[in-house]
């Protein structure tokens, strides 16, 4: 008996060792092929860049008396008298130092270190694109799943139409429209933020139509949902208009309580179902604990640091996870996730509450035109010493470009998720799960959703790789100096160093994220 157990253990160890060797072999093979592709592409891009124009064109047209000295200096800085392959290998030698953590991407035509320019550009692009990518993934996957479940319904047709509209609309057109109506017109409206009764009824009706289509079910159920949503939106808009809420928005701890409880019920229903009373009690307990933690720290939250906010968020997440693990019962894993998302929702409500407290002060500092159209921050901002004013300034500058990038990417995620989900829902094992009497929520969330996410993994990995590349058109329209601006400036000046730095970072990110996607396939695929 012991001999058989030992043989079984040895066989298991050999199997695990073989799998590990195969994984390492796969990674090394992929890295070798990727390095060869990067090397070939870098040669082609370098040649194309240096032949894209005349790097001395602006100086040749200059009327400066020291024009020749400027030309000679640029020739020396850019090594224009050297053959292209000498310049290329000089760049390659500096870039190869990245393997020992000492990257040297050279200097641009002005003599500035490209390393410094690259760090600033990456930080700007990550701020601009990260949130939009996360929002696009979350919203796109959610609406993709919902449209697949409600195939050929009114909700499906509306979301499909909106998705194709955003996908077809050129990004520069959408960005310009956002600047005109989301910033300029909105800032003008803030001078007297009242909403006419006709507009109130129109927006309430649109919200009611959306709510009833999202609820689904029988006509009676959708009618009740639509009527309730209409009344809620109507009352909310009337109150907002009559109190001129946008001039000095107030949320308060009552708002935080409502959001916390609502998120607890929502995530409990999504992950466990409301029939699991134990899970619901755990999420409500996590909600209450999160609220008490933030209430206890409220004195420090008027002038916090990012470190304090991170510690508080981590604390409520860990507390929720412990509650779910200890008291979650047979569905403890699902309860843990429900508690984690509930804690995050409560944190966001607290964050929004403190931003609202400082909104009136911020609008006064920026001349009553809070929504920005250009740049990453207000020049010579007077409220820089106050944490929440800095946060509001960053958010108002991120708002429009984030919306622009989110809605364009949202269309792709919605369509891909819908088609993948429909394919999975037609599989035999889904019919088997339904025939066994499993609830539809369990069939969707535990059996169909995970498999439907396998093709989406590649798109998500590619999008995160594109984070570093930024969004050239969006950056240009909204005046952000990110990776796109770095690439464009190098190309305009026929300067290969910024262009090659852009290529190196984005190419490496693409290789790494595609490899991560391949590894995630093995984890997600059951």
What are these regions (language model features)?
Residues 24-32, 115-127, 159-166, 392, ...:
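Alpha-helical membrane-interface segments at transmembrane helix boundaries
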Residues 30, 47, 51-58, 141-146, ...:
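Membrane-spanning helices that line or support transport/gating and their immediate boundary helices
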Residues 66-98, 478-489:
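Short hydrophobic, aromatic-rich alpha-helical segments embedded in or entering the lipid bilayer
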Residues 28, 32, 36, 40, ...:
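Hydrophobic alpha-helical transmembrane segments of multipass integral membrane proteins
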Residues 131, 138-145, 204-496, 505-523:
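Alpha-helical transmembrane segments of integral membrane proteins
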Residues 38-86, 195, 358-389:
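Hydrophobic alpha-helical transmembrane segments of membrane transport/permease proteins
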Residues 16-23, 79-141:
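An internal, D/E-rich "acidic patch" concept
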């Amino acid at each position: 008996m012991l001999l058989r157990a030992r043989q079984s253990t040895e066989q298991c160890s050999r199997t695990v060792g073989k799998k590990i060797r195969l994984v390492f072999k796969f990674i090394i093979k992929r890295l070798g092929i990727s390095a060869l592709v990067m090397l070939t592409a870098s040669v082609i891009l370098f040649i194309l860049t240096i032949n894209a124009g005349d790097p001395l064109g602006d100086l040749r047209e200059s009327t400066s008396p020291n024009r020749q000295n400027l030309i000679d200096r640029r020739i020396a800085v850019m090594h224009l008298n050297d053959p292209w392959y000498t310049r290329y290998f000089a760049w390659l030698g500096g870039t190869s130092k990245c393997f020992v953590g000492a990257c040297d991407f050279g200097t641009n035509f002005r003599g500035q270190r490209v390393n410094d320019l690259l760090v600033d550009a990456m930080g700007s692009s990550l701020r601009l694109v990260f949130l939009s990518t996360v929002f696009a993934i979350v919203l796109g996957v959610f609406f993709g799943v919902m449209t697949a479940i409600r195939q050929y319904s009114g909700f499906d047709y509306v979301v499909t139409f909106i998705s194709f509209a955003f996908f077809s609309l050129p990004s520069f057109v959408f960005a310009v429209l956002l600047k005109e109506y989301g910033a300029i017109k909105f800032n003008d409206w803030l001078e007297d933020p009242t909403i006419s009764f006709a507009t109130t009824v129109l927006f309430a009706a649109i919200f009611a139509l959306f709510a009833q289509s999202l609820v689904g079910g029988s006509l009676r159920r959708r009618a009740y949902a639509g009527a309730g949503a209409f009344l809620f939106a109507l009352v909310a808009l009337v109150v907002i208009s009559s109190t001129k809420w946008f001039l000095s928005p107030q949320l308060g701890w009552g708002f935080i309580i409502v959001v916390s409880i609502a998120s607890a019920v929502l995530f409990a229903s999504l992950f466990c179902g409301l029939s699991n009373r134990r899970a619901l009690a755990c999420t409500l307990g996590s909600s209450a604990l999160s609220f008490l933690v933030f209430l206890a720290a409220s004195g420090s939250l008027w002038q916090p640091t990012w470190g304090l906010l991170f510690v508080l968020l981590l604390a409520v997440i860990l507390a929720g996870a412990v509650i779910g693990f200890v008291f979650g019962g047979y569905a403890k894993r699902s309860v843990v996730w429900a508690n984690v998302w509930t804690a995050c929702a409560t944190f966001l409500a607290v964050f929004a509450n403190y931003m609202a407290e400082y909104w009136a002060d911020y609008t006064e500092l920026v001349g009553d035109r809070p929504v920005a159209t250009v740049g990453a921050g207000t020049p010579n901002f007077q409220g820089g010493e106050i944490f929440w004013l800095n946060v509001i300034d960053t958010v108002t500058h991120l708002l429009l470009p984030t919306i622009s990038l989110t809605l364009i990417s949202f269309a792709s995620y919605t369509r891909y998720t819908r088609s993948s989900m429909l394919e999975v829902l037609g599989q035999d094992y889904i019919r088997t799960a339904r025939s066994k009497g499993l609830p539809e929520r369990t069939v969707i969330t535990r059996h169909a959703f995970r498999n439907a996410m396998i093709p989406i993994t590649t798109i998500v990995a590619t999008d995160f790789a594109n984070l570093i590349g930024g969004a050239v058109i969006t950056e240009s329209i909204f005046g952000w100096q990110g990776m796109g601006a770095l690439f464009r400036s190098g190309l305009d000046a026929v300067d290969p160093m910024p262009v090659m730095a852009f290529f190196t970072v984005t190419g490496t990110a693409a290789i790494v994220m595609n490899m991560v996607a391949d590894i995630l396939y093995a984890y997600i695929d059951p």
